[in-house]
């Protein structure tokens, strides 16, 4: 259970957090059927029961709202990775859980992942907005411990640290190139849904798991070569 007392957070911050989360949920619901370009701000505002003017007080554009979702997703999978790492004493197991969990969540709405891929391609390597506020972290992940410490900057805020821990634990060779392996993991995360997600969304999780096993095996093989 989260140790932060939500009641101790100012009411204005809690209202702001609830509105942002409501807008993210509205966006995800519509992305399941429509592209980001097709979705109107007026629709999102109506779904979240706010005015269009209020929407723009929170997010300059729809793209900024999608970026905000990616930040919230980062918190969610970061909490999962932290739990799995502790339970299995394995950073590689945490990476696998992160990818598989995301694939399973998006299997019912593969368009969402495709829109995220398009969004990332359009906007990288742009800077991330400011960090997610504490009230929103607590509301979004009420059962997560130390939610204020979770990274909110996408894969880049999670994977390199886990790969470094895997090297330190001996799960990967000491001479592993973490930067290159991070790129390979990212290619698996985005590439598999792009290639097969629209046609076979239920196959993405297993394919990603297999790709990761190949990556780990390749890294270990370099040590013995």
Regions found by a protein language model. Name each.
Residues 1-6, 104, 153, 157, ...:
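C-terminal peripheral helix-coil segments that are non-catalytic and often amphipathic
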Residues 78, 123-169, 179-183, 194, ...:
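Amphipathic alpha-helical packing segments from all-alpha helical-bundle domains
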Residues 68, 82-123:
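Hydrophobic alpha-helical connector segments
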Residues 1-47:
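Basic, helix-initiating cap at the start of DNA-binding domains
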Residues 23, 38, 61-66, 77:
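Short amphipathic alpha-helical segment with a characteristic S/N-K-E followed by hydrophobic residues
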Residues 41, 70-78:
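Short, basic, alpha-helical segments at the C-terminal edge of helix-turn-helix-like DNA-binding modules
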């Amino acid at each position: 259970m989260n140790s932060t007392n939500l009641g101790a957070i100012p009411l204005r911050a809690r209202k702001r957090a609830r509105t942002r989360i409501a807008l993210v949920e509205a966006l995800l619901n519509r992305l399941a059927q429509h592209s980001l370009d097709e979705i109107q701000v007026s629709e999102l505002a109506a779904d979240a029961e706010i005015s269009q003017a209020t929407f723009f007080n929170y997010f300059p554009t729809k793209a900024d709202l999608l970026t905000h979702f990616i930040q919230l997703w980062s918190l969610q999978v970061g909490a999962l990775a932290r739990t799995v790492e502790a339970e299995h004493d394995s950073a590689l197991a945490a990476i696998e859980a992160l990818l598989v969990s995301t694939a399973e969540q998006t299997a019912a709405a593969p368009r969402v992942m495709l829109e995220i891929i398009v969004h990332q391609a359009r906007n990288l390597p742009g800077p991330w907005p400011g960090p997610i506020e504490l009230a929103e972290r607590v509301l979004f992940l009420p059962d997560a411990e130390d939610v204020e410490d979770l990274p909110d900057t996408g894969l880049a805020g999670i994977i390199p640290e886990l790969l470094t821990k895997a090297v330190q634990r001996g799960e990967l060779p000491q001479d592993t190139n973490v930067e290159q392996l991070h790129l390979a993991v990212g290619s698996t995360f985005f590439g598999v849904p792009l290639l097969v997600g629209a046609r076979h969304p239920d196959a993405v999780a297993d394919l990603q798991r297999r790709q990761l096993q190949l990556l780990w095996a390749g890294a270990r093989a370099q040590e013995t070569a």
